[in-house]
Amino acid sequence: MSKVIGIDLGTTNSCVAVMESGQPKVIENSEGVRTTPSVVAFTEDGERLIGQPAKRQAVTNPDYTFFAIKRLIGRMMDDPTVKKDIDMVPYKIVPSDSNDAWVQGRDKKYSPSEISAFTLQKMKETAESYLGEKVEKAVITVPAYFDDAQRQATKDAGKIAGLEVLRIINEPTAAALAYGLDKGENKTIAVFDLGGGTFDVSVLEIGDGVFEVKATNGDTFLGGEDFDMRIVQYLADEFKKENGIDLKSDKLALQRLKEEAEKAKKELSSATSYEVNLPFITADASGPKHLNIKLSRAKLEALVEDLVKRTLEPCKKALKDAGLSPSDIDDIVLVGGMTRMPKVQEAVKGFFGKDPHKGVNPDEVVAMGAAIQAGVLQGDVKDVLLLDVTPLSLGIETLGGVFTRLIDRNTTIPTKKSQTFSTADDNQTAVTIRVSQGEREMAADNKLLGQFDLVGIPPSPRGLPQIEVTFDIDANGIVNVSAKDKATGKEQQIRIQASGGLSDDDIEQMVKDAEANADADKKKKELVEAHNGAEAMIHQTEKQLEEFGDKVPGEDKDAIDAALTELKEVKDGEDLEAIQQKTQALVQAAMKLGEAMYAAQQTEAAEADAKSDAEGDEDVVDAEFSEVDDDKKKDA
């Protein structure tokens, strides 16, 4: 049975882990790094780059380098958070046919699920390379505060990447699993998870292998990206004051600012000041302009103070829902790269009244927890029971647009709940069930997850028909809803899919595209390797010809020259087979050069030995000696 892997699909970075000898192990990628940037790029020549190679070329290819795509997953174009992002990223966010937020690639529009799938493919390949076997199943993490549409879109991404997603698990819960795997004592912990694009806080009770989430809260549009943007805004404003040029309207400059902002933010976690130095950032009629601004830690903290404060309100709500006070928390586990910021650690300590626990790697702990959950599902990890919750209340729209809750937030999942409703008008033969998720009292203020019709209700006075609505949330936090007319037994049900979202046909097509691209990528890689091999062989042969060409018989030299010419003719082409054949032909022809080289070396070695022997004879000194017998030696 193939291994089930755990993947932390992050906003900024992603990470993959697997269980080995009862412990989670984070796997290094092909670059030898344990985390991979969640960045995907499409180059001018049609190549698709993922991870560090994509991030490295972002400055020269800002329109088609996609980062922080997780902030768009499962969202509509009219979502206020999407509108905010449109102004802040250099790539184009465009509407799909169903008004979902997608991105514009070079050749077509891509859904955030597709872009995320490319990162998941990289994680899958990383695991396969390490394990030496095919990987087909995974546990993938999402922010605890992700709604149904976002969870479904993440599951779709896994499917497009060729993975069967056995479970979607909340990031703070995964972190708690990794933190508490070997801890026997009973504890109440808070997981404070501030990542690249999202913030979550979860309160859990752990002990004897049981991990029970008591409450969760968060903000799916608060993370490191927002901190970076504050620095970008500040640098752009300072530059404009001095030079009268708005760098934000220049995509290239904006990308350079973003990279430098991220670097400054990281440096200022340990240093007290950082010199932002960007030569030739732009130019005007007077010539090139350079940006040179000193940023202190104090200034950075002032710029992001309100963002740090925004993390505390969800903490209050989570504790209130759990019926606890800050002093009831035994340990605070910090997750996400942003928790390295001293100001964030200060805020956590101030709120909970104690120093946070720093025994876990904030960048890797979520993937490790996902691997543990994968081990549980595979049967490799025993005596671990995970009880998670739904982050938001679920209900339907009733008369007057009121949001009627069927399942309250922080209800343990999986769960099932039914409630009976009736008609609003006389002789009503159909009802529309509008399913929403959120905490507001009016349905219109909450997130509409989907709607469906129950038809064929016998005409009756209003209030008489009995329609039973059932909500069923699975362990992934994904919702199924059914409505049944008790009189006729007629039933209608749907697996909730956002009014946009990807249909099964869309996903199937994307899976096919991904598979086709995987083949194309493989061929492209083989072609690049063949080009490189041909270049290396040509260079090596020409160098050897210069040194030893005169020692090779004429006909052999002609054969080598002919093979060289033939390889040069095809080496830059697209015919992989021809390049490989001609390279091999040159390898065979060049063997004569190798023979000549060895013959020359042997001749030189023999001459050197002969010379050494001759010189040795010249240095011989004649000496007289007399033999002393043993008896004389004893007398001496």
Swiss-Prot record:
Residues 600-636 are annotated as: Disordered. The keyword ATP-binding applies. It comes from the Bacteria. InterPro entries: ATPase_NBD (IPR043129), Chaperone_DnaK (IPR012725), Heat_shock_70_CS (IPR018181), HSP70_C_sf (IPR029048), HSP70_peptide-bd_sf (IPR029047), Hsp_70_fam (IPR013126). Keywords: ATP-binding, Chaperone, Nucleotide-binding, Phosphoprotein, Stress response. Pfam families: HSP70. The keyword Chaperone applies. Residues 615-629 have a biased composition (Acidic residues). Transmembrane segments: none annotated. Induction: By stress conditions e.g. heat shock. PROSITE patterns: HSP70_1 (PS00297), HSP70_2 (PS00329), HSP70_3 (PS01036). One of its GO terms (molecular function) is ATP binding. PANTHER family: HEAT SHOCK PROTEIN 70KDA. Belongs to the heat shock protein 70 family. This is Chaperone protein DnaK.
